[in-house]
A protein has these predicted regions:
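Short beta-strand/loop segments at the ligand-binding rim of alpha/beta enzyme cores
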Residues: 20-24, 174-187, 236-244
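Active-site-adjacent "subsite" loops/lids of carbohydrate-active enzymes
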Residues: 14, 22-86
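Catalytic domains of carbohydrate-active enzymes, especially glycoside hydrolases
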Residues: 1-12, 86-91, 202-208, 261-269
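Active-site beta-loop-alpha junctions enriched in small/polar residues
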Residues: 8, 28-30, 94-99, 186-188, ...
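Substrate-binding cleft of secreted/luminal carbohydrate-active enzymes
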Residues: 205, 210-223, 227-231, 237-295
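Aromatic-lined substrate-binding rim segments of carbohydrate-active enzymes
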Residues: 1-46, 154-178
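Generic structural signal for hydrophobic
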Residues: 16, 76, 83-84, 200, ...
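Polysaccharide-binding and catalytic clefts of secreted carbohydrate-active enzymes
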Residues: 57-205, 211-218
């Protein structure tokens, strides 16, 4: 069992260690507003030519970097290694390790007054000068001139691979420091490729936390099982899969949701937005009933 903290307080991390809990530092990866003034050129550009530096998609905090810019991967690797060096930190947890959502979960469309039944130019990244030049060097084509970019597999793979290379650089650095590395990822992983250009099935992390928030997709608890099954099959024993569950979505089907996760091969679960002490006790009783051990 463990806890993830978005920040660092040595006393909290030490208390976790004393209680027999792992303590992991959770930090956003590609979404880095702290670089807005230092490296404005590092930020991703959509197909309309708009940069997340000054016109982010959806919400103001969506300040995503371009993974192809020189210096981005090394900056991120160095940052996570600094975190890994901190006392009592057992590992680092990556989040927002992707491009902005080219397709949002369907339940969120109404929040922005959009219907994403196709890819919209303003949410399709990255078309900065670096990405265009690198893709043209590889293929002889300018991605801005592609008639159907959403169907061009070379262009899709170019962006999937760009994120993977950044993750590989971070992973190598963190593991060299002897620490664990995990990530919050989109469910699937087939959905992750389509929605956020995230090919996490080809990463080499120690654990994955697919965000299987069934309510976001108007799905019932059975969908949790299908998503876990695909995730477990994809990693094929190379890493652990912890089903990320949105507590308000599963509160009324708590045990059913847990069954769907564990019966389909999840090594464990993580909860977002809760649960209360009452449900933590229910969770402990569930684990005892199933004969499942906390790690």
């Amino acid at each position: 069992s463990g806890v993830m903290f978005e920040g660092y307080d040595e006393n909290l991390y030490r208390m976790c260690k004393e209680a027999g809990l792992e303590a992991h530092f959770w930090k956003w990866t590609m979404n880095r507003a702290e670089l807005l003034n230092v490296h404005p050129d590092w930020f991703a550009v959509n197909r309309k030519g708009e940069s997340t530096h000054d016109k982010p998609a959806y919400v103001d905090y969506y300040r995503f970097l371009c993974p192809n810019h020189e210096g981005v991967a090394q900056y991120l690797a160095d940052d996570y290694v600094k975190i890994a060096h901190l006392p009592y930190v057992d590992g680092v947890h990556l989040d927002y390790v992707r491009f902005p959502d080219v397709v949002l979960p369907v339940s969120l469309w109404k929040n922005y007054g959009i219907e994403q039944t196709s890819e919209h130019f303003e949410y399709d990244y990255c078309y900065c000068e670096v990405c265009r030049a690198k893709f043209k060097a590889q293929t002889g084509r300018d991605p801005l001139e592609l008639k159907y970019p959403m169907e061009d597999q070379s262009w899709i793979n170019f962006r999937l691979d760009a994120i993977t290379r950044v993750v590989d650089r971070i992973t190598e650095a963190v593991k060299a420091d002897g620490k664990a590395i995990s990530a919050a990822v989109f469910p699937g992983p087939s959905m992750a490729k389509k929605m956020v250009r995230q090919d996490w099935g080809n990463w080499t992390l120690d654990a994955y936390f697919p965000m299987i928030y069934n309510g976001f997709y108007y799905e019932g608890p059975e969908w949790i099982g299908r998503s876990v099954q695909e995730s477990v099959k994809t990693v094929d024993g190379r890493a652990k899969v912890y089903a990320g569950l949105m507590f308000p979505d599963i509160k009324n089907d708590f045990e059913k949701a847990l069954d769907e996760a564990f019966d389909n091969g999840a090594s464990g679960v993580s909860f977002f937005d809760g649960p209360s002490d009452e449900y933590l006790h229910k969770f402990k009783a569930y684990l005892d009933k199933k004969g499942l051990k906390t790690e």
